[in-house]
Regions:
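Cleavable N-terminal export/targeting peptides
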Residues: 1-35
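Gram-negative and organellar
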Residues: 24-207
């Protein structure tokens, strides 16, 4: 039986803005960092493909590394060479109002000798902003991913025959309302981890 852990957080944040006015066509540095349309993405900033009201940012990479202790053990260390194949895509809107961004990625880890350690991780997500008025915005994001715990992780059983697989569902939502130099924000977040059962090196199910 898999193990599921959920967490929900709700917070209210009130921020006093500095002196000075901001015109309708200007955004402060803080506003730009918070606004999903202005978030910097160094990995994707180099090339973009325009597609109507969206820009598509594809990414592909190949990496390799040598690990002299792939099981992160204190004795009987095992070495191997690992190849990582990754591909990802991000689609961002170019609208003057509102925003919608989508992303997805896949990473394949291939071990030269210890193929039981091979794993496939992937993720998908969407985030956006609804500009209700000049001073009011809704923001939200939802993400889902399948991943594996690293060997040596404190929560990962050392006797597992394969890396522990888990899925993660996340969601966030917030509402901002500006009152002259005062901004009130209400935000909440949710996360749910689902750890899959594993089998030990002697065939015992690890729950």
């Amino acid at each position: 039986m898999s193990s599921v852990y959920s967490k929900f957080a709700l917070a209210t944040l009130v921020v006093v803005m500095g002196a000075g006015s901001v015109s309708a066509n200007q955004l402060s540095d803080t506003d730009q960092r918070d606004n999903v349309r202005y978030k910097t993405r160094p990995a994707y900033d180099a090339v973009g493909i325009r597609a109507g009201g969206f820009t598509v940012f594809p990414l592909a990479s190949v990496a390799g590394k040598y690990d002299d202790n792939i099981y992160a053990t204190d004795v009987n260390e095992t070495d191997d060479f690992i190849t990582q194949l990754s591909t990802a895509v991000e689609v961002n809107s170019n609208w003057s109002r509102h925003a919608l961004n989508l992303n997805a990625g896949v990473s394949q880890y291939i071990y030269a000798d210890n193929t039981d350690e091979n794993r496939l991780d992937w993720n998908v997500g969407v985030n956006g902003q609804l500009d209700v008025t000049r001073n009011s915005q809704f923001r939200g994001a939802v993400g889902y991913q399948q991943a594996h715990e690293d060997r040596g992780d404190p929560s990962s059983p050392a006797t597992a025959s394969e890396p522990i697989k888990y899925t993660l569902l996340t969601g966030t939502a917030s509402f901002d309302q500006k009152f002259n130099r005062l901004t009130a924000r209400v935000s909440g977040g949710y996360s749910e981890y689902d750890y899959k059962d594993a089998v030990s090196t002697v065939g015992v199910v690890i729950d």
